Amino acid sequence: LHPGTGAYYEMRDYYNRLTEEEIRGNPDMICAMSMLRSMTFEPEESEKWYEILKEYIRHMDRGDSDYRRVCGLQSYLEIGLPHRGTEGLAKKLPAVAKLLTSKTVALPEMSVTSNLPSLLRGGKDFSEWVPKDKGLYNTIRIPVEMVLGRYGVGLGDIALTESLLEKGEDVSGRFLSLTALQEELRARGTPEMEFVLAALLVRTLLTAGNTGKARDLLLQFRAEAVERGATRLLPNIDAMRCRLSLLDGGTFASVWFSELAPNEAVFYGMERYRYLTKVRCCIKHRQYHAALLLLGRMLDYTRRYARPLDMLETLILISICRYRMESDDWREHFASALELGWKYGYVAVFTREGAALLPLLERFDHRAVKPDYWEKILSGTVVQAGYYGQYLRPPDIPLTRLTQMETLILRLISQDKSNEEICALLDIKMPTAKTHVRNLFKKLKVSSRAEAQKAARRLGLV
């Protein structure tokens, strides 16, 4: 079992029914509890069980036939616990590789993707490695792939390409080598890594405005995942389909939002990709408070679990949400996003928001931002807005924003108030009321009060 398949979380009810005494007597259960508590947002409990495992090992006979395997469980937790981030990992992985080579430990199989379409922010967020990605590729690629076994096949090349893509660099020249990796992954790798590779190709195609090819590739991979029984990948594959649908105005996004979106009543970190997809749907449908509630939980999670790239995406979506709510604090959140993005050199996480982000860029005072960094973000966002002009645009949004008075009058019309009643309630004269109603009808593209009421409900204006 490993967190990549979600098995620990799926079996949480079983583990929670066990007594502490029962768990303490089994090193596999101790390891499972440490990982489970980390995954369920209880890092202190996770560390408690990690220490219990260390104590268990100290009391073992080194000649015990199970000693190597149990030591491997400790190494597994040291590498894989989600809440520990990546600090020291670049040194730890080669050290574990040496232990494997000398047969000092035996590691359980582990996934680095958590079923997500990313290596940079799979089981851990590797943002700290991004500024020095090429150097790390040359120094630790081989030991990392050794430690991860099947899950390490192609990892170095995929991770480097994703890092370059996130920094806004052109990765089309790496397509040939990545395509060749597909066959190697099918032969020696895992469906999880194949998903990351497919997602990387999809994102590259979308960056170039090629939605048709991107959709075909994603649907082809989905069909293969179903055929091979890799159904654990489907929730995140469908979340990616939803994001693609949001870009090109397809119908799948509405289906996903109403039928497949996750329920965050119990917050589960491994659902983060789907949570941020749901947030985009909420923003599109003007459900801003629902979006902010979920974004607030994501912000807390990303801070506590050292996930800079997920935090950056969260801050950008908060900025868009607050901007659409006409709150001035969007600038504060966006400034934080720019500061964090510049630290790691991230560009694509901004530019992918295209038409949804462009109005913010046009109104933000960017004098404190490095000019070359700002130019990369602005130019890339303009290109994406050109490809996907309808992205996150509310359904049938009026071309001109309603004034505060027009919004008040629309609400009163929705309550079946007459012009006379509107004049009395708002203390305005009849000609003024008629002018506002006429302008309101023009903006809503309607010709009667009944049509105005329907438009108000459809647009979420009342």
Segments the model singles out, each with a brief description of its role:
Residues 1-29, 33:
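Extended alpha-helical scaffolding segments used for macromolecular assembly and cargo binding
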Residues 2, 37, 82, 124-127, ...:
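Residue at a conserved register position within TPR or TPR-like alpha-solenoid repeats
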Residues 5, 40, 81-85, 167-168, ...:
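Structural motif corresponding to the intra-repeat A-B loop/turn of tetratricopeptide repeats
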Residues 10-17, 44-55, 86-101, 130-144, ...:
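Alpha-helical repeat scaffolds
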Residues 22-196:
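Internal alpha-solenoid helical repeat scaffolds
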Residues 25-28, 62-72, 103-120, 144-160, ...:
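Alpha-solenoid helical repeat architecture
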Residues 252-253, 271, 275-297, 303-308, ...:
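Linker/hinge segments immediately adjacent to helix-turn-helix/homeobox DNA-binding domains
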Residues 389-438, 442-447, 453-462:
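Helix-turn-helix DNA-binding segment
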